[in-house]
């Protein structure tokens, strides 16, 4: 059974995308099509902030792209040596909060110790931070242009200072239409389509509706989390599956249940 995932491929240590591998364990043939591209912004300013950990109570990373922005800052400004020598240790003396295991893995690669990765989404991370944070200094939050206000609002309501800096913007992947056309012409209508963000839904839904035609009612739509599920529902699409956590294992389990007769998760 063929399933379509609207995300870019990420190879793990085994040289395979973990989503393809996990779905394959259930006999599902997954194809990945990227729908988003990212452009980095304000890196000199972000680099300067990373150079002054004494000004902040800690860091918040809620997306892999924000971590990539930090990596670029270190590479482009010849800060790798000073990062390894002193900055990394100073940041590790503070809290580094993250959402999800994928983001946590990237943060650990630049030498930072993380906490909160099991929270899974911004709402739960906000609760976690509020239960622990006592520093009078602001938390530094590198984010994208489409960031939601749940985390900033929750922290503000609890009197926890936070300083946001937009370090990337989300744009449509230039190959969306062509890649979807190729997929449908070669594979036909998939049994399931998974969306990984509201913006990914925005950029791809029209093409999917046109290509699926009357067969769109046969597709089981899945979401990686509650925010994306709400975006699907707002477009009038039935959500057959919302992953219990943003992991390949949880999504594969959910899709398998949704594709079983009368299945729903």
Curated annotation (Swiss-Prot):
Its EC number is 4.2.1.75. Changing residue 63 to A: Does not affect enzymatic activity. CDD domains: HemD. Changing residue 103 to A: Slightly affects enzymatic activity. It holds the Pfam family HEM4. Changing residue 129 to T: In CEP; no residual activity. Changing residue 69 to T: In CEP; less than 2% wild-type activity. GO terms for biological process: cellular response to amine stimulus; cellular response to arsenic-containing substance; heme A biosynthetic process; heme B biosynthetic process; heme biosynthetic process; heme O biosynthetic process; protoporphyrinogen IX biosynthetic process; response to platinum ion. InterPro entries: 4pyrrol_syn_uPrphyn_synt_sf, 4pyrrol_synth_uPrphyn_synth, UROS/Hem4. It is found in: Cytoplasm, Cytosol. Pathway: Porphyrin-containing compound metabolism; protoporphyrin-IX biosynthesis; coproporphyrinogen-III from 5-aminolevulinate: step 3/4. Keywords: Cytoplasm, Disease variant, Heme biosynthesis, Lyase, Porphyrin biosynthesis. Changing residue 212 to P: In CEP; no residual activity. Optimum pH is 8.2. GO terms for molecular function: folic acid binding; uroporphyrinogen-III synthase activity. Catalyzes cyclization of the linear tetrapyrrole, hydroxymethylbilane, to the macrocyclic uroporphyrinogen III, the branch point for the various sub-pathways leading to the wide diversity of porphyrins. Porphyrins act as cofactors for a multitude of enzymes that perform a variety of processes within the cell such as methionine synthesis (vitamin B12) or oxygen transport (heme). This is Uroporphyrinogen-III synthase. It comes from Homo sapiens (Human).
């Amino acid at each position: 059974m063929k399933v379509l995932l609207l995300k870019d491929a990420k190879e793990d240590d085994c040289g395979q995308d973990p989503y393809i591998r996990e779905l394959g364990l259930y006999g599902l043939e997954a194809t990945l099509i990227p729908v988003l591209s990212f452009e980095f912004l304000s890196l000199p300013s972000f680099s300067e902030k990373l150079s002054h950990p004494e000004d902040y109570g800690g860091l918040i990373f809620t997306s892999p792209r924000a971590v990539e922005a930090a990596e670029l800052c270190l590479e482009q400004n010849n800060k790798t040596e000073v990062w390894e020598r002193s900055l990394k240790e100073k940041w590790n003396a503070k809290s580094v909060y993250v959402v999800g295991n994928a983001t946590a893995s990237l943060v650990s690669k630049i030498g930072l110790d993380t906490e909160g990765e099991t929270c899974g989404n911004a709402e739960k991370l906000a609760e976690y931070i509020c239960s622990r944070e006592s520093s009078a200094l602001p938390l530094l939050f590198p984010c994208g242009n489409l960031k939601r206000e749940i985390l900033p609002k929750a922290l503000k309501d609890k009197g926890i200072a936070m300083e946001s800096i937009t370090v990337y913007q989300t744009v449509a992947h230039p190959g969306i239409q062509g890649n979807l056309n190729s997929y449908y012409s070669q594979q036909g209508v998939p049994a399931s389509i998974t969306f990984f963000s509201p913006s990914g839904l925005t950029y791809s839904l029209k093409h999917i509706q046109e290509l699926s035609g009357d067969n769109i009612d046969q597709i089981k739509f899945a979401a990686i989390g509650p925010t994306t599920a709400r975006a699907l529902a707002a477009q009038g699409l039935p959500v057959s599956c919302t992953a219990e956590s943003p992991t390949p294992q949880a999504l594969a389990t959910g899709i398998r249940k949704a594709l079983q007769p009368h299945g729903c998760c």
